[in-house]
Amino acid sequence: DIVIITSGIGRKPGQSRIDLAQTNVNIMKDIAPKIAAVAPNALYVIVSNPVDIMTYVFTRVSGIPESQIIGSGTILDTARLRYDLSHRYNIAQKNIHAYVYGEHGDTSFIPWSLAQISGCPLSEYEDMVVKQCATKDRLDPEQTLKYVQKSGGEIIAKKGATFYAVSASVNKIL
């Protein structure tokens, strides 16, 4: 069995994930033991925001072993990074091996020295692209990080919520 926990209030435009913390912690403290009692052997995927805090709270109050609990972490941030790089270089996302680390959202970071495209370090790939395409600007790491960190808030401001990307990222975990 797999249990996906998405409970909690959603972000409103202009709100940070951390603004949701106390309310969502209280919700998690209430539901975690009840769900764990019904499905003690399940694998749990925590998606509620702020996801790192909610995963920690679930682990502490549910009684479920840590080996059965996964937080969605920065999988969505990583997908946004790969999307951005795939459009920049006009290549398939499956060929991009770059990750976002840290806490999901505004405090995440990109370890650029680990990023690769088809096995080639991103810095070398970037040098080849700039050399071959005189019109191509160099990658701006800060701008890319800002895009990754702020995309969720921009979607919420325009659409009111982020549904599809979150669902797709959970599907990838499963």
Please report, for each region that a protein language model flagged, where it lies by residue:
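N-terminal Rossmann-like NAD(P) cofactor-binding module of classical short-chain dehydrogenase/reductase
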Residues: 3-4
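Conserved NAD(P)H cofactor-binding loop of Rossmann-fold oxidoreductase domains
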Residues: 7-9
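N-terminal glycine-rich phosphate/adenylate-binding segment common to multiple enzyme folds
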Residues: 11-13
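Rossmann-like NAD(P)(H) cofactor-binding subdomain of soluble oxidoreductases
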Residues: 16-82
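C-terminal substrate-binding/catalytic lobe of Rossmann-fold NAD(P)-dependent dehydrogenases
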Residues: 62-68, 77-174
